[in-house]
């Protein structure tokens, strides 16, 4: 089976080497609600994604909500309207595997977040923050420098601003008329793709257990419109045949089952690679901000001056 991924490994080994230094293991912060703000239906459990951390939040008692900003109409081969319906259905099924409570769709046009006024998208995210009162916001790293996907860039930027501004009463004061009060979010986790370039770096790893990795794998497989589809296995077989290669484990399997096996292997592999960077079995890496990261030097000041109450 591993021969299938030689070409993938050649690319990803470069990614792993970019982060060769061990990262510290982070503990989950205190809280009850995590709001996952993403552009697309599948960004929670892509190969570089956050499904393991979401599953761990749920395991530790958090309520988790998923926001997809776009309608995902371009993701798949069934035409815009049907792609939208299939991808929403698969997103609901996948997030249930992770234990999430709800999928909230903003339904902006897929691959069209550039023309959207940033303050309009930001206002929607602020409204959701004020409605669901998250302790933690999770999404793409808004400060990563090598993000090719425009929806990822734009939604991440809106997320970063909403995370900061949702606590200010003078920002979107119209929300008060529908009973939504300002709400401060203390913790932010940002996820970046390091295989696209050496950009903004993660500063912690979050350890995952076997069950959380398995949930991530199952959620990833659920997105068969774009990931674990028969077409991906057929394309791989054609590419290997050109090199006079094949995968013995695929003999007797349908293209669908072969695709699922391939995705299972890769999701376990990437979680293991991340774990190796922190000296544990499985992990995911993130750029993390906590309640003391707002001002430069604040942590050093607190470290020098804090005293425990008697």
Predicted regions and their residues:
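Stable alpha-helical elements in mature extracytoplasmic
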Residues: 50, 87, 121, 125, ...
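Acidic beta-to-alpha connecting loop that harbors the catalytic carboxylate
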Residues: 41, 143, 223
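C-terminal accessory domains and tails appended to enzymatic cores
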Residues: 21, 30-31, 168-184, 191-310
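Short, low-complexity, charge-dense intrinsically disordered segments
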Residues: 1-13
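Active-site adenylate/phosphate-handling loop in enzymes that bind or generate adenylated species
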Residues: 130-174
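Short, well-ordered beta-to-alpha junction loops that form the rim of enzyme active sites
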Residues: 108, 139-142, 192-193
């Amino acid at each position: 089976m591993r021969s299938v991924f030689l070409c993938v490994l050649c690319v990803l080994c470069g990614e792993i080497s970019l982060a060769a230094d061990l990262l510290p293991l982070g503990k989950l912060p205190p809280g009850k609600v995590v709001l996952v703000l993403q552009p697309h239906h599948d960004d929670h459990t892509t190969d570089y994604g956050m499904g393991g951390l979401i599953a761990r939040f749920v395991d530790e008692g958090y309520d988790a909500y998923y926001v997809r900003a776009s309608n995902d109409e371009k993701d798949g081969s069934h035409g815009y309207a049907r792609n939208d319906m299939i991808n929403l259905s698969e997103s609901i099924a996948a997030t249930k595997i992770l234990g999430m409570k709800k999928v909230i769709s903003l339904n902006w046009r897929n691959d069209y977040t550039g023309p959207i006024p940033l303050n309009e998208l930001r206002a929607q995210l602020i409204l959701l923050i004020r409605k669901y009162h998250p302790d933690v916001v999770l999404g793409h790293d808004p400060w990563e420098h090598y993000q090719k996907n425009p929806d990822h860039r734009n939604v991440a930027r809106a997320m970063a601003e909403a995370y900061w501004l949702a606590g200010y009463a003078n920002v979107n004061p119209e929300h008060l008329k529908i009973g939504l009060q300002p709400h401060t979010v203390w913790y932010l986790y940002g996820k970046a793709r390091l295989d696209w370039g050496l950009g903004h770096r993660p500063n912690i790893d979050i350890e995952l257990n076997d069950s959380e990795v398995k949930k991530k794998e199952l959620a990833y497989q659920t997105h068969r419109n774009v990931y674990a589809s028969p077409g991906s296995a057929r394309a791989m077989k054609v590419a290997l045949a050109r090199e006079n290669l094949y995968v013995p484990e695929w003999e007797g399997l349908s293209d669908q089952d072969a695709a699922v096996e391939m995705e299972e292997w890769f999701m376990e592999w990437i979680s293991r690679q991340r774990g190796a960077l922190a000296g544990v079995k499985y992990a995911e890496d993130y750029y993390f901000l906590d309640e003391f990261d707002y001002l430069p030097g604040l942590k050093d000041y607190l470290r020098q001056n804090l005293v425990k109450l008697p």
